[in-house]
């Protein structure tokens, strides 16, 4: 399993939100590029970047911070937040982002996901954010009647590289991931699933691994910044 350290960008800084609330942001580093370099130097093979302002605005907002991260690091980075049209997808991939994450648009315009995945094989992931198994969109502000497993399966023939599954009620709350729901999704679809939301201890990573589900990896943010998860130990746990 791959450990994806999260760098959530708000107003040019690396922050973490509590349960997706933009008014409950903790700044962890005012230099996201330095933070990214630290993760790379510690042995991380990927970076997970989120343009939080972009997710709410529907268009890129923290482009300068993302570009600074790309200039400072050499490991691949995936990026989500405010990517809702082909021009933005092409822009980010052209700047060196390895994989774009389509969230809201995967619900509102699934044909864009299909077109992008076809045009850029291996470089388009879908971010599915859920509350009680139902998909939420637009920076988690709107809930839908769509079930996560149904939406995931609908993209199986599209060539989507990965699904990033976030349980909103666990995100940034340090309560542990929803292992059962994450494992169930990974078993229900042929698309690689990356666990996100609530990974707050080494035991959480062990639980995801012990689920036996075919998980590609796990994203962790706050726990790495707080020191609740030792990065070297986490990499070792997932590498076993």
Curated annotation (Swiss-Prot):
CDD domains named among the record's database cross-references: HisA
Keywords annotated in UniProt: Amino-acid biosynthesis, Cytoplasm, Histidine biosynthesis, Isomerase
GO terms classed as biological process: L-histidine biosynthetic process; L-tryptophan biosynthetic process
Main localisation: cytoplasm
Protein's cellular compartments: Cytoplasm
Any GO MF annotation of the entry: 1-(5-phosphoribosyl)-5-[(5-phosphoribosylamino)methylideneamino]imidazole-4-carboxamide isomerase activity
UniProt superkingdom: Bacteria
NCBIfam families xrefs: 1-(5-phosphoribosyl)-5-[(5-phosphoribosylamino)methylideneamino]imidazole-4-carboxamide isomerase
Protein name: 1-(5-phosphoribosyl)-5-[(5-phosphoribosylamino)methylideneamino] imidazole-4-carboxamide isomerase
Annotated gene: hisA
